[in-house]
């Protein structure tokens, strides 16, 4: 499964909605496809052979349960998300790290360049109720992070840019979750990760945080690192930062 080529739908009442999405993403409409973006009455999902339906979820109920344990996570220790802090998640993926950061009060903008993943994230955002929106400040721009940063004015620089590049080593472990397996196959390796890190350092106020496999050499020597069991969080400080 290298790429999604079709949009499917659960029943004929959803055909028009599926067709609109297929046209938007330049995909085929195929109700019988076994690998596709799949429209159900409740949500947009990813249908992959031998997997259950997968979808993004930004309900406050789901993520508030993880907030307590999140305080001990390297992600939180590295990014230090608090109310009023502006964070760009430059490689949003399924949006899970972005959601965790948002539960701590940060204003998180997700950037996702893969159209299929961006569609899944957008659908998850659209399903939120008012309580979800109040508790988690999340937004999305379907864009390549490098292009987006190039277009950014200095007054709009975020406090933190978080980067979780797709790395081949991440897919070799039997412990890799199904969502990461699918993301790896769908997106592939982020070969422009070095370029993104360097560009981020000139477009951020406080720090750049990179999630990277624990035993793999960093792309750039970090100013600090927070180690986990299988990954670490490398921290890079821009030269002009006062933090």
Swiss-Prot record:
This is Ribosomal RNA small subunit methyltransferase J. Belongs to the methyltransferase superfamily. RsmJ family. InterPro entries: 16SrRNA_methylTrfase_J, SAM-dependent_MTases_sf. Specifically methylates the guanosine in position 1516 of 16S rRNA. It catalyses: guanosine(1516) in 16S rRNA + S-adenosyl-L-methionine = N(2)-methylguanosine(1516) in 16S rRNA + S-adenosyl-L-homocysteine + H(+). Pfam families: SAM_MT. PANTHER family: RIBOSOMAL RNA SMALL SUBUNIT METHYLTRANSFERASE J. S-adenosyl-L-methionine binds at residues 112-113, 164. Its EC number is 2.1.1.242. GO terms for cellular component: cytoplasm. Its main location: cytoplasm. Keywords: Cytoplasm, Methyltransferase, rRNA processing, S-adenosyl-L-methionine, Transferase. It is an enzyme of class 2 (transferase). It is found in: Cytoplasm. GO terms for molecular function: rRNA (guanine-N2-)-methyltransferase activity.
């Amino acid at each position: 499964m290298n790429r999604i080529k079709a949009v499917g739908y659960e029943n004929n009442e959803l055909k028009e909605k599926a067709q609109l999405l297929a046209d938007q993403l330049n995909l085929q409409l195929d109700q019988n496809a076994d690998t596709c973006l799949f429209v159900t009455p409740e949500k947009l999902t990813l249908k992959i052979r031998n997997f259950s339906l997968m979808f993004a979820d930004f309900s406050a109920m789901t993520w508030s349960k993880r907030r307590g344990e999140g305080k001990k996570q390297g992600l939180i220790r590295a990014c230090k998300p608090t109310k009023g802090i502006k964070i760009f998640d430059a490689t949003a993926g399924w949006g899970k790290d972005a959601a965790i950061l948002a539960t701590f009060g940060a204003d998180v903008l997700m950037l996702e360049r893969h159209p299929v993943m961006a569609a899944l994230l957008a659908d998850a955002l659209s399903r939120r109720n008012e309580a979800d929106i109040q508790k988690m400040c999340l937004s999305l721009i379907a864009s390549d992070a490098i292009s987006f940063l190039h277009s950014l004015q200095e007054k709009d620089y975020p406090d933190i840019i978080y980067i979780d590049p797709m790395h081949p080593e991440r897919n070799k472990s039997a412990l890799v979750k199904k969502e990461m397996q699918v993301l790896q196959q769908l997106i592939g390796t982020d070969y422009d990760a070095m370029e993104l890190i360097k560009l981020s350092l000139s477009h951020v106020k406080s720090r750049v945080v990179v999630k990277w496999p624990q035993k793999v050499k960093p792309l750039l020597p970090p100013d600090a690192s927070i180690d986990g069991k299988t990954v670490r969080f490398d921290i890079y400080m821009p030269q002009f930062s006062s933090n």
